[in-house]
Every structure is written in C-alpha cells, then in structure tokens.
C-alpha cells in the first residue's frame, strides 16, 4: 500500500541537483525510462559535445543558446524552437551571451519506441491555437513526441480532469497552478515537473491572478496525430 508521500514522489519526483565543473547546474527528475533536466547555463559557458544511448529533446525557457546536434548548429531563443538529438548523436551547446540561460532537456530510452528527427534535428513551431477558451497552446511535433506550451488563465482557469492513452510529462515555467494526478495534488511552481502514465487521471487549475505557463510532452502525440502520421509515412 503506497502512502501519500510515495504517490507524490511517483508523480512529482523530488529533483536532484547536479553541479558540473563548468558551472552548469541541473535539477534532475526521473520516473521510469524518462529524465527531465532543468538546466541553468552561466554566461559564456560551453557544454562540450557528448552522446549517449538515450534520445534527448529540449528547448530554451529563458535566454539564447547556440545548440549543436550532429553537424548542425542553430541559435535557440526562448520557446521558439526545440531540438531532437537521437540516440548516440553528438550534441552540445554554448551560451554566448552575458545572461544566464535556462533550458529544459528530456532524456528517454523506452523499449519499443523509434526516435526519429528532422534532417537538421530542429523543430519549428507547428501551430498555435486555443485548446480551451482562453487557453492558448503552441505545438512542436515529431512522429513519436509532441511538445505543447500551454497558458492557463488566472482566477480559476483549468484543464478539466481527464485521462488518455498517452504518457504525459509537464514542467511549470511561469506562474503557478494546482496539478492533481490520481488524487495526489501539488502546487506547481517554476521548475516543478510531473509524470503521468497512460490512463492516469489528471487535471490542473490556476487559482492565482496571473496566467501560468507550462511545457507538456506527450508520448506519442495526442493533439496532432494526423501530423505525426504524415511524418511517419514520409519516413517509410
């Protein structure tokens, strides 16, 4: 029998701090086959190219980062693009600015999944629309993953309780809101991550005056399945 504390640690794992010699700080949250990293990159800092067996996806939350995947380098500004580094593909980054950069990276290796990417490894915004009245969302899509940036309006804006076949992970990147998974509720603040497995009931409500913002990742895509199928057909 799991205690309330056990359930909270399952759905909202306590992040562990990783400090690197170059000054980069990362807060790591893990459930199962997936790790969420919230990274703080100091000004004029280089993250040397490296590779690993996991796929890695990411985006910049604050600031500007020069990101290299394979032999492709692109400047990434906050929430304007995402990258995919497939398994064993070298990737690194450099903060060339005078400001600290905050980025989110997700590492994953799950049996049965195939990790495709665009030829240049970077995803542009696919579309922006209202998911619910007043809740604007922006999507980045590849055939096995969908990234959704969501604004939850203040003063009671909510994502009603629901469940689906997709695995869902989310990170609060602005404001705050209450997130509940299978009856376990946590106050989401900047950097808090949640992990929701398929068919686990979940919902969110913003009781604050200001809008909140979150990054939500779906495996496989939930809202843009047709786009994903077209990408899959193109690859085959």
Swiss-Prot record:
Pfam families assigned: Cupin_2
Positions with a binding annotation for a divalent metal cation 1: 50, 52, 56, 91
| Keywords from the named record | Antibiotic biosynthesis, Cobalt, Cytoplasm, Iron, Isomerase, Metal-binding
Pathway info: Antibiotic biosynthesis; bacilysin biosynthesis
Recorded GO MF terms: cobalt ion binding; intramolecular oxidoreductase activity, transposing C=C bonds; iron ion binding
Q: Which GO terms describe its biological process?
A: antibiotic biosynthetic process
The EC number(s) attached to this protein equal 5.3.3.19
Q: Quote the SUPFAM superfamilies the UniProt record gives.
A: RmlC-like cupins (SSF51182)
Tell me the ranges covered by the Cupin type-1 domain, including all copies. 40-106, 151-215
Give the note describing cofactor binding and stoichiometry: Binds 2 Fe(2+) or Co(2+) ions per subunit.
List localization entries: Cytoplasm
Superkingdom as given in the UniProt entry? Bacteria
The prosthetic group or cofactor this protein requires is:
Fe(2+); Co(2+)
The UniProt annotation places substrate binding at 223
GO cellular component: a single term = cytoplasm
Q: Which residues bind a divalent metal cation 2?
A: 162, 164, 168, 202
Q: Which reaction does it catalyse?
A: 3-[(4R)-4-hydroxycyclohexa-1,5-dien-1-yl]-2-oxopropanoate = 3-[(1E,4R)-4-hydroxycyclohex-2-en-1-ylidene]pyruvate
Question: Gene3D superfamilies, per this entry?
Answer: Jelly Rolls (2.60.120.10)
Q: What does this protein do?
A: Part of the bacABCDEF operon responsible for the biosynthesis of the nonribosomally synthesized dipeptide antibiotic bacilysin, composed of L-alanine and L-anticapsin. Bacilysin is an irreversible inactivator of the glutaminase domain of glucosamine synthetase. BacB catalyzes the allylic isomerization of the endocyclic-delta(4),delta(8)-7R-dihydro-hydroxyphenylpyruvate (en-H2HPP) to generate a mixture of 3E,7R- and 3Z, 7R-olefins of the exocyclic-delta(3),delta(5)-dihydro-hydroxyphenylpyruvate (ex-H2HPP).
Q: How does it assemble?
A: Monomer.
What protein name applies here? H2HPP isomerase
Which source organism? Bacillus subtilis
């Amino acid at each position: 029998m799991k205690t309330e504390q056990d359930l909270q640690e399952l759905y909202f794992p306590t992040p562990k701090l990783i400090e690197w010699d170059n000054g980069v700080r990362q807060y790591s949250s893990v459930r199962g086959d997936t790790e969420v990293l919230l990274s703080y990159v100091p000004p004029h800092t280089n993250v040397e190219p490296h590779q690993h067996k996991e796929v890695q996806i990411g985006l910049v939350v604050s600031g500007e980062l020069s990101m290299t995947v394979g032999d492709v380098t692109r400047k990434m500004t906050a929430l304007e693009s995402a990258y995919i580094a497939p398994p064993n593909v070298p990737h690194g980054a450099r903060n060339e600015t005078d400001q600290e950069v905050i980025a989110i990276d997700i590492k994953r290796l799950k049996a049965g999944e195939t990790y495709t990417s665009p030829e240049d490894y970077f995803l542009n915004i696919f579309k922006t629309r209202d998911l619910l009245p007043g809740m604007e969302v922006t999507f980045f899509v590849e055939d096995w993953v969908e990234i959704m940036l969501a604004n939850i309006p203040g003063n009671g804006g909510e994502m009603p309780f629901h469940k689906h076949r997709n695995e869902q992970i989310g990170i609060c990147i602005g404001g705050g809101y209450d997130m509940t998974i299978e009856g376990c509720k946590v106050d989401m603040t900047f950097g808090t991550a949640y992990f929701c497995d398929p068919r686990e009931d979940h919902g969110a409500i913003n009781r604050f005056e200001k809008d909140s913002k979150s990054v939500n990742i779906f495996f496989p895509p939930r809202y843009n399945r047709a786009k994903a199928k077209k990408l899959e057909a193109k690859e085959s």
